Curated annotation (Swiss-Prot):
Known function: Seems to be involved in pore-forming activity and may contribute to the unspecific permeability of the peroxisomal membrane.
Subcellular location: Peroxisome membrane
Annotated membrane topology: Multi-pass membrane protein
PANTHER family reported in the protein's UniProt record: PEROXISOMAL MEMBRANE PROTEIN 2, PEROXISOMAL MEMBRANE PROTEIN 2, PXMP2 MPV17
Statement: the UniProt record of this protein carries the keyword Acetylation: no
Keyword Membrane assigned: yes
Assembly behavior: Interacts with PEX19 and SIVA1.
Name of protein: Peroxisomal membrane protein 2
Residue intervals on the Peroxisomal side: 52-75, 136-173
Keyword annotations of the record: Membrane, Peroxisome, Transmembrane, Transmembrane helix
Organism: Homo sapiens
Length: 195
């Protein structure tokens, strides 16, 4: 290992356990990129829902210790089967459809993400959550009528600067992770819409 890299890690304060965990994550990312991103998305999505429940409890000043275990489970399923894999392939194909050398590539990528991927992904979120919650088509239609546009407008406000950074400056293999970390708070917002 290069001395400069070792020194940088030491200065960053990474202990042995975080270094090993990071090395293991990078190895899995290289060997099993879709599965690693799916697992990461599932875990962080569940954590986002758990965070939403904790925020909701604090806001309502509830003292009960009970949590809706189904919420994090639904978000874990959605993150594992949809967010991780779909985001992986979207970022991968976007990199090939709009390579960095293309004029205005950053703007084109952002427009593709914001005007095509974001609305479709949000609609998919509402559909899958409706199914996982055991609700019928009329509940989905009501959620789309009442929650889709407010959620999409909030998505555009919150995610546009984050996605500009993610799409144009974050290395391809880390884009799903970057989005997942930001999504901790986004899923907390979406979960609060469901209440």
């Amino acid at each position: 290992m290069a001395p400069a890299a070792s020194r940088l890690r030491a200065e960053a304060g990474l202990g042995a356990l975080p270094r090993r965990a990071l090395a293991q994550y990078l190895l899995f990312l290289r060997l099993y990129p879709v599965l690693t991103k799916a697992a990461t998305s599932g875990i962080l999505s569940a954590l986002g829902n758990f965070l939403a429940q904790m925020i909701e409890k604090k806001r309502k000043k509830e003292n009960s210790r009970s949590l809706d275990v189904g919420g994090p489970l639904r978000y874990a399923v959605y993150g594992f089967f949809f967010t991780g894999p779909l985001s992986h392939f979207f970022y991968f194909f976007m990199e090939h459809w709009i390579p960095p050398e293309v004029p205005l590539a950053g703007l084109r990528r952002l427009l593709l993400d914001r005007l095509v991927f974001a609305p479709a992904f949000l609609m998919l979120f509402f559909l899958i959550m409706n199914f996982l919650e055991g609700k019928d088509a009329s509940a989905f239609a009501a959620k789309m009528r009442g929650g889709f546009w407010p959620a999409l407008r909030m998505n555009w406000r919150v995610w546009t600067p984050l996605q500009f950074i993610n799409i144009n400056y974050v290395p391809l293999k880390f884009r799903v992770l970057f989005a997942n970390l930001a999504a901790l708070f986004w899923y907390a917002y979406l979960a609060s819409l469901g209440k």
